[in-house]
């Protein structure tokens, strides 16, 4: 009886003339529907806010790019749909935008004290949530309902401007697109500001599901099919991790890893790999800086598990499958949707902690070569299709595993973004000095996005885990050798 007077939410009326489009199969998943992403870029120059806003609005109204202006609705069957305006006005713009202006330098704002700065040694340099006053504007979306019950575009822009700095935050529902698509949007936005709209590519059409056949006819089983965790196994895993998943507070902290540190780790690893004989049909062992950085973070993350040497560490890594799916996605057209899947590495704790970093990095590189082909992507997506209505990704390992999730955006090069076209004064490139990403309303525990390398070559990454587990990383970092990364 306590809900008798509770107000029922009502979705905005359907606007006649809006183009109604079904969500693509791989976008319409439980996980992607749940999360709103907030991607913040800090520039140490004053930018023309009106130019920024106008350019993004024009992009959202542009033919082929109007998905950015889409509104989310449920149809009579309860399925999500994009309702894409065909006409725009000041009352119904393409892009939801907010702006806060401060008549001071950034250094005089209280939150500036929390802005992470590069470090001489690998270190935790900040907490992402401390910057909430910068990345969340008035009426900022934080959950799916904020899109369903308001006439809000799936993409939003929040700008905080100072005399000497500008903070831009793109927010969007993850069901709209992934990190690779975000970079395509940033590049197109920049071309509008540069007056080079004729160079903006036309995206793959949002009117049809370009990946509708992906995973429907795999030619081979997945490489880890025999290690796929059953539904019962995942229930057992969830129950054994219920405290961390649902009761302990999760924190998203920022880690800076100096350029020289990663370069040294990589050089040592390449020397060590000479002693690793390649497998049948394999080339001479090689690892990238990304491989060794992922291995290094994984070792930090499980440094407290030495008493469980045989426990499986499941390292799942997101990758964009666009390049290997050319039968579905043309190379000259950006795909403004989700096309990121996972490759997986399963190694025991004793190997992650007891063997050289190069060993774990090599396992990651082998998994990339083995599991990110077109054939294996088809097999992975076939498993995803078989997971039921929620379309949860397949998990590999066992019910007692420690799962770590990574996503490396270094090749996307967000730090290479040049917004000099919007600079109010000065010449030369205007690149972000700091970038972070936050997800709401929930946080995935043990998730580590690698944002990329700044102009000085420093790697920036964030991690979401419990406060207790961050204490473990703090301790492990204090014990790190400054040259080799060994403990």
Curated annotation (Swiss-Prot):
Acetyltransferase; part of the gene cluster that mediates the biosynthesis of the tetrahydroxanthone dimer neosartorin, which exhibits antibacterial activity. The two different monomeric units appear to be synthesized by the same set of enzymes, among which the Baeyer-Villiger monooxygenase nsrF is the key enzyme for the divergence of the biosynthetic routes. The pathway begins with the synthesis of atrochrysone thioester by the polyketide synthase nsrB. The atrochrysone carboxyl ACP thioesterase nsrC then breaks the thioester bond and releases the atrochrysone carboxylic acid from AacuL. Disruption phenotype: Impairs the production of neosartorin and accumulates deacetylneosartorin and novofumigatin A. This is Acetyltransferase nsrL. Pfam families: Transferase (PF02458). Disulfide bonds: none annotated. One of its GO terms (biological process) is terpenoid biosynthetic process. Its EC number is 2.3.1.-. It comes from the Eukaryota. The keyword Hydrolase does not apply. GO terms for molecular function: acyltransferase activity. Monomer. It is an enzyme of class 2 (transferase). Pathway: Secondary metabolite biosynthesis; terpenoid biosynthesis. Belongs to the plant acyltransferase family. PANTHER family: FAMILY REGULATORY PROTEIN, PUTATIVE (AFU_ORTHOLOGUE AFUA_3G14730)-RELATED (PTHR31896:SF69). The lineage of its organism: Eukaryota, Fungi, Dikarya, Ascomycota, Pezizomycotina. The active site is at 174 (proton acceptor), 418 (proton acceptor). Keywords: Acyltransferase, Transferase.
